[in-house]
Regions:
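Mid-domain, small-residue-enriched loop/turn segments at the edges of structured enzyme/sensor domains
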Residues: 13, 21, 144
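Phosphate-handling DNA/RNA-contact segment within nucleic-acid enzymes
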Residues: 31-189, 207
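Acidic, metal-coordinating catalytic cores used for nucleic-acid/nucleotide bond scission
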Residues: 139, 157-160, 197-207, 225, ...
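C-terminal or mid-to-C-terminal helical accessory/interaction module adjacent to the motor/catalytic core
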Residues: 218-245
Length: 245
């Protein structure tokens, strides 16, 4: 019952129970200390709760509270499939006092600039096809994979940066030659890096900024924006799986 609102939202976005299980989507209930109390009962210290990024600390360290409350939750996994952080979307569309999306802060194991959401699922197909599609959000990755675009990944609430470039180069077979200042890579030639962010002005700006980071790829780089302003999740919902190429 607590997760009913989360289920309604996700079903309305075209995701069924199988797809939610595939991506490990969950729910963090409302309340300030649900998770903190469970973790304390299992022997974790308050310092460990805060260090994990799952809990925050009040002024003066007087209170430890759940960072994620009343949110749909996505596990963020590294390339090996190990969970290193979480991303959460608020359920209420009316409460503008809290961020719509909230990610785990920087921790000993989570560095947002070094993680691409969905890479654990996409890595084999990226290496095989020499193609990667970079989208903006968690539901966009889900929609793309469910539509057969299994090379889709997303940044985790940050811009596409130098560390992301290095990750993609490695998967595509791009090899840097520092002495020459160029990128070479036989496997990457003919490969593709496609950025497809939201169709609004902010999304287009983000895509062009990401494209600017990419000018040293041996693979071809493209920016794809839907003419109607749809993101991949909206496009799949409006026009079906075949609408995402």
């Amino acid at each position: 019952p607590l997760a009913a609102g989360a289920g309604r939202f996700l079903y309305s976005r075209g995701f069924d129970d199988d797809s939610l299980e595939r991506f490990g989507v969950g729910f963090a209930p409302a309340g300030w200390d649900n998770l903190a109390n469970v973790l304390r009962s299992r022997g974790f210290t308050e310092r460990e709760l805060v260090a994990s990024g799952l809990c925050g600390e009040g002024a003066g360290g007087r209170r430890v509270y759940d960072r994620f409350r009343d949110r749909i939750m996505w596990p963020i996994r590294d390339v090996t499939g190990a969970t290193v952080g979480f991303g959460g979307r608020r359920l209420s569309e009316e409460d503008a006092t809290v961020p719509k999306y909230l990610n785990t802060p920087e921790t000993a194991i989570y560095h947002k600039g070094q993680v691409l959401y969905g890479l654990d699922l996409a890595k084999r197909d990226i290496a095989r096809d020499h193609r990667i599609v970079v989208v903006e959000g968690y539901t966009d990755v889900m929609a793309a994979h469910l539509s057969g675009v299994t090379t889709a990944v997303a940044t985790c609430g940050t811009s596409f940066g130098a560390d992301h470039v290095r990750i993609v180069r490695r998967l595509l077979g791009d090899v840097a030659d520092p002495s020459a200042g160029v990128i070479t890579g036989r496997r990457a030639r003919g490969g593709e890096v496609v950025f497809t962010f939201d169709g609004d002005a902010a999304g287009q700006k983000a895509a062009l900024r990401a494209y600017g980071e990419d000018q040293h790829f041996a693979a071809q780089t493209f920016v794809a924006v839907d003419p109607h302003g749809y993101d991949p999740c909206d496009l799949r919902l409006a026009e079906g799986n075949d609408a995402i190429p």
